[in-house]
Design a protein with these regions (language model features):
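Short, mixed-charge low-complexity intrinsically disordered segments
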Residues: 37-79
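Eukaryotic short linear interaction motifs
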Residues: 15-16, 29, 61
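Short aromatic-glycine-(Arg/Gly/Cys) micro-motifs in beta-strand/loop hairpins
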Residues: 1-15
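Short amphipathic alpha-helical surface micro-motifs
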Residues: 1-3, 31-37, 53
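A short, charged, amphipathic alpha-helix used as a generic interaction element across diverse proteins
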Residues: 24-44
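A short, exposed loop/beta-hairpin motif centered on an aromatic-Gly-Thr core
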Residues: 15-23
């Protein structure tokens, strides 16, 4: 089974604020969109500072780990 790993890059701190697993790009983007609308979350406080990337895929049957960085979400400023 393939596991996909994602990261939320903080443009101000110049590091990943969060790294974790998600089912696919759409479910990761949905999570980011929900947090972007909630000002109680770190993303919601300043969404324009964050970009979401798919970072890697891991196959738990073969042990293959593939690094690749693909932008799948970008925060937009609060209106």
């Amino acid at each position: 089974m393939e596991h996909l790993y994602y990261g939320i890059w903080d443009n101000v701190a110049k590091c990943y604020a969060w790294v974790g697993e998600s089912k696919n790009n759409a479910t990761f983007a949905r999570m980011c969109n929900v947090m972007e609308k909630d000002e109680k979350t770190f993303i919601g406080q300043s969404p324009q500072d964050y970009i979401g990337y798919q970072l890697a895929a891991f196959n738990d049957e073969t042990g293959e780990f593939c690094n690749h960085k693909e932008k799948v979400w970008e925060g937009k400023p609060n209106e």
